[in-house]
Amino acid sequence: MSILASIQRQVTPIHPEGYPFIGGFAVATLVLSWLWSPLGWLGLMATLWCAYFFRDPARLTPLDESIVISPADGIVSSVGYHMPPPELGLGAEPMQRISVFMSVFDCHVNRAPVTGRVTKIVYRPGLFLNADLDKASMDNERNGLVIENNNGRFGVVQIAGLVARRIVCFAEKGDHLTTGERFGLIRFGSRLDVYMPEGVRPLVGVGAKAVAGETILADRQTDKPRPAFRYG
């Protein structure tokens, strides 16, 4: 392995969505430094924080079709049965839902919780309430995906929050996503909801720490061999 490749493996990459923001903070830092050097230090701290926010670390993802992986870094804020957003067309009955709240200090790159085909993507404008509130699922700006596989249909909803005002979704209808694959990003604090079909059993509780692409949120099977993993 070359020295450059070794360094690249040690340094956490920055997601391209963050480049304009980091560049803006860097320019502001130069201007502030020219005006008054102490302000330049504040600008430098803000620039470093922005780079930290848009970090995009590689993850070790379990490869098992029966499990559901966390789509986001953060804290599990809700586990239970809730009505899915009507625009997703997932039916008129409550579904098992697990919500992960992301603070401004969490990595905000979103990853697919399951492998499957994206059959629907629907954006809905809305409010910008605290994303940790239960009513934020229906009242806030959101972007929902339906992912279908042999286990059924899963709803994945990106929800904007008080600070987050920009939902980014890289996936398109018809795409085939693999578990842990990057599909979106929400800027500056938000939440991800995962709606699961019957037979999928939650394995986490409220307050649990979740890591996108790694933490197993739920499982369809109880007795099975240890899954393989993918790093990326």
Swiss-Prot record:
Q: Where is this site: Cleavage (non-hydrolytic)?
A: G189, S190
> Where is the PTM Pyruvic acid (Ser) found along the chain?
S190
Enzyme class at the top of the EC tree: lyase
Any one Gene Ontology molecular-function term assigned to this protein's record: phosphatidylserine decarboxylase activity
Q: For this protein, what does the record note about how its cofactor is bound?
A: Binds 1 pyruvoyl group covalently per subunit.
Q: How does it assemble?
A: Heterodimer of a large membrane-associated beta subunit and a small pyruvoyl-containing alpha subunit.
Q: What is this protein called?
A: Phosphatidylserine decarboxylase proenzyme
Please give the organism: Beijerinckia indica subsp. indica (strain ATCC 9039 / DSM 1715 / NCIMB 8712)
Per the record, the gene is: psd
